[in-house]
Structure formats: C-alpha cells, structure tokens
Amino acid sequence: MILIKNAKILTPKGIVEGNLKVEGKKISEIGGKAVKSDVVIDGSRKAVIPGFFNTHTHAAMTLFRSYADDMQLHEWLEKKIWPLEAKLDDKAVYWGTKLACVEMLKSGTVFFNDMYFFPEAIARAAEECGIRACVSAAFFDFFNPDLLELNLKNAVKSLREIEKYDVLRAIGPHAVYTVSLDGLRRAAEIAEEMDIFMHFHLAETEKEVLDFKKQHGKLIVQALDEIGFLSKRLIAAHSVWLEDAEIEILAKKGVSVAHCPASNMKLCVGKAIRYEAMKRAGVNFTLATDGAASNNNLDMLEEMKFAALLQKFHHSNPTLLKAEEVFEAATLNGAKAFGIKSGVIKEGYEADIVLVDLAKPYMQPEHSLIANLVYAASSGCVDTVIVKGEVVVEGGVFRSEEEELKIIEKANEVAKRLTGSA
C-alpha cells in the first residue's frame, strides 16, 4: 500500500487537501486518515495529478533527436531519416525506446502508443521500464499485392510474439500513401479478429489529401469508412486536413484523434487541426508528441501548451482550447481511447499518478493549478510518478541514477553507430 500524505489532490470535483491511498493498482481512498503503509510519500507542497497519455509516438526515434532539423518533410525523410532507419536492428530500437521511456516517465507520462520497427524490442523495453504502452506492428505494402501478404503475415507474427508482455497491442498500417485500401481493409479485419487496436497516420499534409482525392475521387475518411476501416479501435494520428463530413464520420465511428502540435508546426503541415469542429462533433480528442526526431522531445507538459497556443494563434481567438480542455485531452481522453480506467484522480481508478513540485518558482502563485500546468510548467516540476500502483520515478530520478545513466550511455552508443560517428 502507498500513502501520499498532506498533498493537494486534483480531482474531477476540484482540489482536495489531504491524503491519498493506493492499494494494489488502484486509488482506494482520497482524503482519508493517515494509516500505516508500505510506502509513505510526503505530499507537502506537492500536487497529485493524473499521469499523461501520449497517444502517438515513434519512441526509438530518440536516437535521431537533433540529427536532422529545419528541412522540408520529404527531404528530411528521404535524405536523413529513412537511410538511418534502414540500419536499425532490435538492439537499437530497444535502447532507443528505453531512453524514450525514461524521458516520458520523468516528465509525467504514464502511457505511450507506439508505432515503429521491431515491436518485440519496444514491448520489452516498456515492460522493463514500468510504463504502460500500446505497441503496434507497423505495416506497409507500397501497393504491391505480394508485399501485402508478406508484411501482413509478419505483422501478425510480431503481434503474437508480444502477447507475452504486459502491453496493449495494435496493428499499425502506416498511411494511405504507403498502404493500399485492400491492405487497410485487411488490417481492420485482423484488429477485429485479434481484438486489438489500430494505429494510423491520417491527413497529416495537404499533399496526402490531394493525391488521394486525385487517385480515388473521394475524401480519405469517406474511403476508409466504405472499406470498414473506422471504429473505436482506431487511433488516427495528426488528422489535420479534414473536412466537416469527415470529422462527423470519425465521431460517429468512435475514432480517437491524436493531435501532435509541436511536430505539425516543426514540419509545417500547413494549418492547425480543426479542434472546434471535432469538439462539436464529439470526436475523442487526445494529445501526443510524435517522435523525438520531429518534436524534439517527448514532454506532454510542453505539448499541452503548444496545442492551446496553436489554436489561439491560428484562429486569432484566445478563448479556444482552454487549459481545462487540453489537460483533459492529455489525460482522460487518452485513457478513454484505450479503454483504460485512468486519466483522473478518483477512487476505484487506476493508480497512474504524478506528483508535481509546487515549490518551483513557475508553479507559483497558485491561482489555478491546471493553468499553471498547461501554460507555466516544465518537466522539471515532476517529482514522483506512479504507474499501476508502482513508484517508477522518485525525487525526479528514474528508479536509480545508475540505471538511468546506463540507458543514456547505451542509447548514445547505438546512435553513434547508426550515424557513423562512433
């Protein structure tokens, strides 16, 4: 049992000052008396908040952080990223993912939804680090029927291999410009048969949308709906260049959208996601960082601020995407997307908890905790992180300094090998 004493607890009904008790993997009591516990955490001058759910990542791309920046998207991919990715192996992905897990946990993220190569290495790294994850078996067919059969077979094989790990699973058909409509239809059938999620890039750029419409004579979401691709299993990353009719379809089918504001701005996708239209339609709107090669960090505190400011600036309206809304997108909505009873501090919910240090200068004065978290905070305020009832970060340190330093060292060795600078 874990007892957090004398904290400011952010609940759905407001801030409760007092104690919080964790039994097993659940929050068992809020505001009760202090009792003898296995672990006692002093919550003085700290706030208890729900952990963040990062709903679209390529975790091992931490290895490419700041390797290639300030470039056009296609040039960036073709000249810098893809040549390095061709050299990846399971060891590289394992250490790159571990580095990402440490970074995410230390900035308050308790869950990430990943799409990358070598899913077994990703699942193993996540489980060892004690973070929640949904691991995708990425799938491409490049419009080649033979490649479709081969790569689908390999994806299913990978999904079966990671079943032994304590992670959720997804099939990850990459995008409409790398996977045929038949491949997308087959991926949806596999997700249904295996009772797993789907992870997909949708309408990230105008070029993607225009090329698809020229080829198929219809909007992407309409075509996806016709082949049975859309459901509550689907997490659609980006979803920037969508029309009203498409947004309505996504809402009707229960699709969750993963908004990646920092990556969208850095890679210049051309406009801001249509948050207000999604809100009106009832789309489950979540938040994500994308990969560290295009962000360049995995800090959800920073991502909340980017999301809110992008809407305000793009639409010249300071009232859009309020602090409370973006905080919910980063926590509760992400948990909802994956059917996890988490994302809020509430009795009976999963103990995915972050303690933030209110003594930091940028967390004062305390007019509004949520506004401070969204507009003022940095990852430096994260003191303690609990995932599934287990303490994984304490005093701002991931488990032990020795383990953290080893992960950083190994990831650097791999990065140097990949770039030829070893």
UniProtKB/Swiss-Prot annotation:
Substrate binds at E85, H174, E204, D290. One of its GO terms (molecular function) is metal ion binding. Zn(2+) binds at H56, H58, H201, D290. The keyword Glycoprotein does not apply. Keywords: Hydrolase, Metal-binding, Zinc. Pfam families: Amidohydro_1. Its EC number is 3.5.4.28, 3.5.4.31. Belongs to the metallo-dependent hydrolases superfamily. MTA/SAH deaminase family. This is 5-methylthioadenosine/S-adenosylhomocysteine deaminase 1. It comes from Archaeoglobus fulgidus (strain ATCC 49558 / DSM 4304 / JCM 9628 / NBRC 100126 / VC-16).
